[in-house]
């Protein structure tokens, strides 16, 4: 039987790594298939905290599926090809487990797709465990809980589904942690930005979206002090510009999210700033503007940008 590689998106966040780790376990232990969870980039500090807390060795980083000798892959926490492994079009996508929009995606063969509008891909993976009558091991439950906490900012994001609090409670019990205490510690681990270069900062959690012929890069960083991040605006803008030139982005939008007060500052550069301003009904001043109540790229930024670019 051929081996499957299971992975989340480029610039992996906690949910991308947790969901792929959990699904690979399900493939091996429940479905009896050879599957390995791998990652498309080095885990960030938040994810590293979760891995260390639950005693899990970080999955190895891969750059090419074909180079690994596999012909089939399973995607978690993404489906858009530009967010996936470099040679995604050269292998068969056997399954997708995701909670995002479907775009820039097609396959030659039928596949298993599980798409749910829930707070995290990890939520879907846990549901699959339950449906198969299996309780995930403590470390798997801990990672899945971490993925859900990360993506929903401890269930405060508008992306939180009505079923997610129960999922979180059950996973916390299996993992043996206090949901609030562990959740705050996890999120705090992801806000250490001072040690990051500007280039690293804008790449911590970044995705490219094809919007009406434009490649728009949308990145997000979590902080407890937006002003502290903006003190580095000049070097951050230089990094955004360099990344846009190197990769052909028409626009670069950075969400600087205050996880305590649930607001964001939008810092944006590019050739379509009129569309960015129209998307959020604000005026950029010195390339940035405040976006009250915004914490979710998926629900409060990308759909609005999509509408504005297609207008």
Swiss-Prot record:
GO cellular component: cytoplasm
Superkingdom field: Bacteria
UniProt-annotated location(s): Cytoplasm
Statement: the UniProt record of this protein carries the keyword Transit peptide: no
InterPro entries xrefs: DDH_dom, DHH_sf, DHHA2, DHHA2_dom_sf, Mn-dep_inorganic_PyrPase, Oligoribo/pAp-PDE_c-di-AMP_PDE
Stretches that traverse the bilayer: none
Keywords (A to Z) from UniProt: Cytoplasm, Hydrolase, Manganese, Metal-binding
SUPFAM superfamilies: DHH phosphoesterases (SSF64182)
Essential cofactor(s): Mn(2+)
Residues engaged in binding Mn(2+) 2: 15, 77, 99, 151
Bound cofactor: record note: Binds 2 manganese ions per subunit.
Swiss-Prot/TrEMBL catalytic activity: diphosphate + H2O = 2 phosphate + H(+)
GO function term, MF aspect, one: manganese ion binding
EC number: 3.6.1.1
Positions annotated to bind Mn(2+) 1: 9, 13, 77
UniProt cross-references to NCBIfam families, sorted A to Z: PRK05427.1
Family in the record: Belongs to the PPase class C family.
Name the record gives this protein: Probable manganese-dependent inorganic pyrophosphatase
Organism: Streptococcus suis (strain 05ZYH33)
